[in-house]
């Protein structure tokens, strides 16, 4: 029997529902249960693919090419279970599907309404494909009380009746603010948030209370009394120094035991949290420190690079060092010309993905600085394209080398990809067509050149990595660029699409068209990030 745990949030946003959900999933996994995680987002966009990084943060890509919420990255990093398109649904997608059915006549001329048609579609999304799992954890985005969330909350209320309360549980995350003037935690916001949830017919069975300090027993009993839950089900979600300490912290608070008790499952035994203890120890007790400069376009909102920051942390874990990140807006180099001053202390330089001409020249300057000063460099997606353009301009005698993304150019080192293969099917993008879902998205295979640095890093010559890009390095320039010393060390299986370039004579210079950060886990760091940080450690020692 599959059991469903629904996680909602109240009082304020950004309390960490995604981390809390992932931590609970990790605890259930540690007890031997098979888990699946899903996210319901109440915005009207069909997916976050066309949303600004400043609005939404990172777009996380799944193996099957779905553009999803960044919380799915947390789910994968905590559980190791690869998410799919079915695991992230928005109001926009639900409405789009229902309207498409209405146009086909699927509703036989009936009046299409939020209840039952929208709520039924939501329920189908929640339960479809879950039979093989012991637990399915479903996070509902937004905050209880938001009008956008109402159809999802109504669907949950109905599902509890459809499946039975013995098969479903509701966990509500709230804020317990501490008021210094009063010298106490205030429970009223939690009480009102639960009342808001009760008003739509949902009684939570557990409260996860975000706080910067332990909850006194008298306050715990007060919350339980006013919110109609057991005192043992009032769990303190304490602030921690690393998100990877959350499974341990929540277990110490009794969260997993209370979930199992509710479902009438054995809970006396202890879960195996040894790998989480090792990860936390490695983070808290590093043997050294390196500084990585990240020259990006969206550094004003660091959630735009959430998986990247986590992957660098994982690389630090693999090398027993603390990784200090220096976030630099690439336009700063264009405006101030202070690249040497800003990068002089960097042990490694990373240029991440992005779209558009803004800040591109600053990224090219960062590539040149890393190449000329022999500093470890990793370019990702757009970063690889800028590395190739820098090579063409500086070494191959092509000063006008550019990308067609920026406008017409005589030397299109990077061009619009209008056709590519997925399996046996050829996919095409029309000029002027919709942007949503039109990129090369998802996991694709690549072949690495035997004996290359990147093949040595991976320990194999065949890989499969996740992509999200619309422009591609022009392979017609391959021979000319390789004469300068740049090596095309990874290609698509048909040899048409460049996937990896490197400078064999450089201390460590690798650029990839894909997004390796999306596959990195704290207990299984991606080899590129482990190798990149290892090179940074060498550079730090050299200094």
Curated annotation (Swiss-Prot):
Any matching Pfam family: CTP_synth_N
- Give GO cellular component annotations, separated by semicolons: cytosol
Q: Name the reaction it catalyses.
A: UTP + L-glutamine + ATP + H2O = CTP + L-glutamate + ADP + phosphate + 2 H(+); L-glutamine + H2O = L-glutamate + NH4(+); UTP + NH4(+) + ATP = CTP + ADP + phosphate + 2 H(+)
Means of activity regulation: Allosterically activated by GTP, when glutamine is the substrate; GTP has no effect on the reaction when ammonia is the substrate. The allosteric effector GTP functions by stabilizing the protein conformation that binds the tetrahedral intermediate(s) formed during glutamine hydrolysis. Inhibited by the product CTP, via allosteric rather than competitive inhibition.
Identify the stretch(es) annotated as Amidoligase domain. Answer: 1-265
Record carries keyword Electron transport? no
Q: Which residues make up the binding site for L-glutamine?
A: 54, 354, 382-385, 405, 470
Highest taxon of the source? Bacteria
Residues annotated as catalytic: 381, 515, 517
Enzyme Commission (EC) number: 6.3.4.2
The UniProt keywords, alphabetically, are: ATP-binding, Glutamine amidotransferase, Ligase, Magnesium, Metal-binding, Nucleotide-binding, Pyrimidine biosynthesis
Its BP terms in the Gene Ontology are:
'de novo' CTP biosynthetic process; pyrimidine nucleobase biosynthetic process
Q: In which pathway does it act?
A: Pyrimidine metabolism; CTP biosynthesis via de novo pathway; CTP from UDP: step 2/2
Residue sites binding CTP per the record: 13, 146-148, 186-191, 222
InterPro entries on file: Class_I_gatase-like, CTP_synthase, CTP_synthase_N, GATASE, GATase1_CTP_Synthase, P-loop_NTPase
Locate the residues binding Mg(2+): 71, 139
Q: What GO MF annotations does this protein's record show? A: ATP binding; CTP synthase activity; glutaminase activity; identical protein binding; metal ion binding
Q: Does the keyword Metal-binding apply?
A: yes
What are the binding positions for UTP in this chain?
13, 186-191, 222
Annotated Glutamine amidotransferase type-1 domain residues: 291-542
- Biological role: Catalyzes the ATP-dependent amination of UTP to CTP with either L-glutamine or ammonia as the source of nitrogen. Regulates intracellular CTP levels through interactions with the four ribonucleotide triphosphates.
Quaternary structure, from the entry = Homotetramer.
Q: What else is known?
A: CTPSs have evolved a hybrid strategy for distinguishing between UTP and CTP. The overlapping regions of the product feedback inhibitory and substrate sites recognize a common feature in both compounds, the triphosphate moiety. To differentiate isosteric substrate and product pyrimidine rings, an additional pocket far from the expected kinase/ligase catalytic site, specifically recognizes the cytosine and ribose portions of the product inhibitor.
Family to which the UniProt record says this protein belongs? Belongs to the CTP synthase family.
What is the name listed in the Swiss-Prot or TrEMBL entry for this protein? CTP synthase
Source organism per UniProt: Gluconobacter oxydans (strain 621H)
Q: Which gene encodes it?
A: pyrG
